[in-house]
Structure formats: C-alpha cells, structure tokens
C-alpha cells in the first residue's frame, strides 16, 4: 500500500493537520468569513499606514528643499553695505521693468504705376492729395504745370496751401510760375502762409518768390500769416526782412490786423522786431487806438447789458 507524500514528511503532515484543524475549527464555529475579513482589515491598515508615512516623508523633504533654496537665494542677494549697493539694486529693478517692444515691420507700398492719361481735374486733385505718381505722369505726357481752374488757381497754389513741399519743388522744376496770381491775385507765397507750412515757405523764398507780393486787397504774405495766426511763418518772413509796415487797401499794417483779431503772440513778435505803433490806417487809427476803440466798444456792450438787466429786475418787482 502506497503512502501519501504528506504522510512521508512529518513536518508537512503536521502543518496540514494544523491548517485543517484551523479551517475545520473556524468553519465549525461559522467564523471563517469573519477571520478573513479581520485579516484583510489588518492588511489594509498596514498599507494605509505605510502610504501616509511615505507622504509625510515626501512633504518633509519638499519643505527642506524649499528652505534650502530660500536660504541660498538670501545668500545670493546683494548686500546693502553702502549707497553704491543700493544704487546697484535700483538699477537691476529698472532693468527688470523694461519690456522689449516688438516693432512691426511695415512694408513700404510699391510705387503706383499710372497707365491712363491724366486729365486736368485729376492733376489738380493729385496736387491736393500729394499723389506724386499722378503729377509725374501728367508732366511726363507734356501737361502744362501752369494750367489753372476757373478761379485761376494752379496746382502749385493747391500744393502750397497743403504744405506738400516735395510736390511744390517738383512743379517748380517742371516750370510752374512762382508768381502766378489767382483771381484774387494771391501768389503761391500767399497760399503757403494760409496753409502754415514753414518748410514750403522757405523753399519758395529760396527759389526767389517775392516776399512782399500784393494780392487784390494789397495784403502781403505777412498780412496773411498774421491774420491766420501762423506764428512760425510770420517769424520767418520778418527774419527775411518782410515789410513790417506794409499797408493794405484799408491802410492797415500787419500790426493793425493783429490787434483787430486779438493775435497776442503776433503783436509781441511785431513789437519785438520794432514795429511802429504810430502808423495810422485809412480810418486814422493807430494800432493802440484800435485797442482803446475795442475796449470802449466792449464797455458799451457790457454797460448796455447791465442797464437792461437792471430794468428787467425792477419791472419784475411790480
């Protein structure tokens, strides 16, 4: 009769016996499931405990690392031993605040090519709008630079009024007449003073424009500059020896115009350059008398308003 393996090995046999006794005992009392459940709970407790410990260790290490980094950072900070150290820190702060600004690259527009013929109306409009290719096309096709509209205004007049200095130079080089007068007998210099471009004014004077040219009202370019309030134009004309005492059709000098229009900066400028304040206009008034006349007129207006309000207040009482 063959023996089983367990029976031949005494230790194994005893183990099996104990296990069978334990299982039998537990099963016998109906507590096997409870024992297994307790065993699992103990295992879970062990596992949870080990995870918590690992997490705590991790947090401790992170705190230590942060502490070391902070300590290192503090050690690397510049020390304030003197004023030079303070200035160094301020300079470093300023550098940090400076931000790089990316400037967008703008492509230059390609030159406009004009194929069709340019008529007179388009030519005048191009002078106003500073469309150089249109002007060049018109001139290249043999167009007359001195052509004018029904008011005898030329392209040069228009370009001067808008301050298109490059176009003015182009038109003059093409043969435009600087002294050409429109219906009101204004020259290019008059139109420039209306527009207020000092650069265009300088160009015209350098090209030989008459500085004291007269229009239909006998006004000079200086009269126009004072009336329109273009200080720099007036100053440049005076510096180029424009006539300070030129009289228009009403006998007014630029100073008379400045007083009448309350151009205080112009008045100071003219006085600075030695204008004669005793010149009388056609009405027999000096600039100073115009000031007094204006003041008296203002007083009369205010006095009239005061008396009117006084009467109204008394009437309202009854």
UniProtKB/Swiss-Prot annotation:
<dbReference type="InterPro" id="IPR002110">
    <property type="entry name" value="Ankyrin_rpt"/>
</dbReference>
<dbReference type="InterPro" id="IPR036770">
    <property type="entry name" value="Ankyrin_rpt-contain_sf"/>
</dbReference>
<feature type="repeat" description="ANK 6">
    <location>
        <begin position="283"/>
        <end position="314"/>
    </location>
</feature>
<dbReference type="Pfam" id="PF12796">
    <property type="entry name" value="Ank_2"/>
</dbReference>
<protein>
    <recommendedName>
        <fullName>Ankyrin repeat domain-containing protein 1</fullName>
    </recommendedName>
</protein>
<feature type="repeat" description="ANK 3">
    <location>
        <begin position="184"/>
        <end position="213"/>
    </location>
</feature>
<feature type="repeat" description="ANK 5">
    <location>
        <begin position="250"/>
        <end position="279"/>
    </location>
</feature>
<keyword id="KW-0677">Repeat</keyword>
<feature type="repeat" description="ANK 1">
    <location>
        <begin position="118"/>
        <end position="147"/>
    </location>
</feature>
<keyword id="KW-0040">ANK repeat</keyword>
<keyword id="KW-0175">Coiled coil</keyword>
<dbReference type="Pfam" id="PF00023">
    <property type="entry name" value="Ank"/>
</dbReference>
<comment type="function">
    <text>May act as a nuclear transcription factor that negatively regulates the expression of cardiac genes.</text>
</comment>
<dbReference type="GO" id="GO:0005737">
    <property type="term" value="C:cytoplasm"/>
</dbReference>
<feature type="repeat" description="ANK 2">
    <location>
        <begin position="151"/>
        <end position="180"/>
    </location>
</feature>
<feature type="coiled-coil region">
    <location>
        <begin position="37"/>
        <end position="77"/>
    </location>
</feature>
<keyword id="KW-0539">Nucleus</keyword>
<dbReference type="GO" id="GO:0005634">
    <property type="term" value="C:nucleus"/>
</dbReference>
<feature type="repeat" description="ANK 4">
    <location>
        <begin position="217"/>
        <end position="246"/>
    </location>
</feature>
